[in-house]
Amino acid sequence: MFCVIYRSTKREQTYLYVEKKDDFSRVPDELMRSFGTPQMAMLLPLDGRKKLVNADLEKVKQALSEQGYYLQLPPPSENLLKKHLAEQGKQSD
């Protein structure tokens, strides 16, 4: 199984995985509008692979077979104030 990964032009660190190059037929229109013009990032073989860097391999495979796409969102931003206060033994309000 192969997938094609596209980078969003509207949302930083957001990627769309599809089964075939330039085939967005199974991706909802609303998602495509909010994603922007897809920029191809890479073609990736999924078979024989044990893991992906920022996505769960099994979830990607399942989403591709069931819905035809997988959307990878950026990791949540770190709350530096909360982290600093935790290190100081305090709580933020």
From Swiss-Prot:
Transmembrane segment boundaries: none
SUPFAM superfamilies noted in UniProt: YcgL-like
Limits of the YcgL domain: 1-85
Cysteines engaged in disulfide bonds, as pairs: none
Annotated InterPro entries: YcgL-like_sf, YcgL_dom
Gene3D superfamilies hit by this protein: YcgL domain (3.10.510.20)
One protein family per Pfam: YcgL
HAMAP family, sorted: UPF0745 (MF_01866)
The protein's name in its UniProt record: YcgL domain-containing protein KPN78578_22820
Source organism of this protein record: Klebsiella pneumoniae subsp. pneumoniae (strain ATCC 700721 / MGH 78578)
